Amino acid sequence: LIYLTSDFSPLTSKKMEILNSKIFGENLTNTPLLVFHGLFGMLDNWGSFGKDLGEYLPVHLIDLRNHGRSFHSDTMSHDDLADDIARYMDHYGIQKAHVLGHSLGGKAVMQFAIKYPERVDKLIVVDISPKAYPPHHQGIIKALETVDFDTVNSRNEVEAVLNQYIPERSTVQFLTKNLYWDDNKKLGWRFNLKTLSEKYTEFVSNAIKFGVFDGETLFIAGAKSNYILPQDEFGIKQQFPKAKVVTVKNAGHWVQAENPIDFANVVKEFLGLN
């Protein structure tokens, strides 16, 4: 089932949009797991994981704002992302959940856990830490902005443009999963490139606001990735004192895609599903 809807939120007095999601195992009654993708991603990236974990507990794969089939907005702060999660849970009557986020999604769930600690059972953060990161997506953003949808008429033509700027074929393939045909039979990006470009520094380069989440927390690092370094553990423990850091072998930043079996097993063990 896929949901795209609006609701009145207790967080505000005005009508607010609810994040788009796909739910696995929704007939199960144990604590649900909410899963959030990274920058330029969407819930479809997590389909196999959702189907697997959905045998054990309800799994909500969720599109962040300005991504996938979720609503577009001109704001994109960590607080915005955290409030979106709270509003989503209110809409579905979820008082408390396990939350998992990869990369940008990891920043969203960290901010959520600090802002709404009573609503988090267990926190899982995938290949990102609470620290500030230097900007490192400028080349990708420039490539995406170079695509002129008034002149390109096929996925192959879009790939040809991106290939001029992005050497990694896997990155180009990942980005082009976001292509869709609009009502005017014109190609476009599902993500809101304008806001993601304008607010990039705010949501990628900024550290998570200081605060403490004292619940059970797991940080999962890719062995081939440099997003979580040994020296980051001190800063992680300052905000997440019960955090454990586990490294998944044979995986870079895209841990769940590059070593899905070991990744899923680490998550299952942490959630007590094995």
Regions inferred by a protein language model and the residue ranges of each:
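Active-site glycine-rich loops that stabilize anionic/oxyanionic intermediates
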Residues: 38-41, 103
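Flexible "cap/lid" loop of the alpha/beta hydrolase fold
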Residues: 111-114, 121-153
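Alpha/beta-hydrolase fold catalytic core
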Residues: 1-34, 54-57, 94-95, 201, ...
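Conserved alpha/beta-hydrolase catalytic His-Asp/Glu region
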Residues: 135, 150-204
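Active-site loop/oxyanion-hole signature of alpha/beta-hydrolase fold enzymes
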Residues: 22-24, 48-54, 60-104, 265-268
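Catalytic active-site module of serine/aspartate enzymes centered on a nucleophile-bearing elbow/loop
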Residues: 243-274
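Conserved serine/cysteine hydrolase catalytic core
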Residues: 184-239, 244-247
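Serine-hydrolase catalytic-loop signature spanning alpha/beta hydrolases and amidase-signature enzymes
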Residues: 40-48
